[in-house]
Amino acid sequence: MNTRRFGIIGEKIAQDYLRKKGYEILETNFYTKRGEIDIITKKDNCIIFIEVKTRTNLNYGTPAMAVNSNKKKNIKFVAKIFLSLNRLKEHEIRFDVIEILIMEGKCKINHIEGIM
């Protein structure tokens, strides 16, 4: 299975998890020339921008470790565009990472809130 297809599976798992936790999914795969945000949700008065990282092992560290400072900068930039386009500037905002680890037929989800 290629990396992109595997990532899509992880994003679907994350979306199901978020819905069960009471998040309203506003948009998925929001693209701009500068980058992309995997999932944008709303809960209470907070807009949450979520990066999903899916892995099958921990050989290169935890999935969240792949969200480096450059990636964080791009996510923040893209988030500003989304907020402006959708006139949502009055909301609180938060940036999260959801780690999906799929090993030996089992799926582990780790939701890290407020990573930036």
Report each predicted region and the residues it spans.
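Acidic-basic catalytic patches of nuclease active cores, encompassing PD-(D/E)XK
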Residues: 1-28
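Mid-chain, well-packed structural core segment of small domains
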Residues: 60-88
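Residue-level signal for inorganic ion chemistry
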Residues: 18, 75, 95
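Conserved catalytic cores of phosphodiester-cleaving nucleases, focusing on short active-site segments
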Residues: 37-59, 67, 75
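Short acidic/glycine-enriched loop/turn segments that link adjacent beta-strands
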Residues: 32-35, 106
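Basic, glycine-rich
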Residues: 21, 31, 100-103
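Domain-level recognition of nuclease-like catalytic cores that cleave nucleotide substrates
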Residues: 84-116
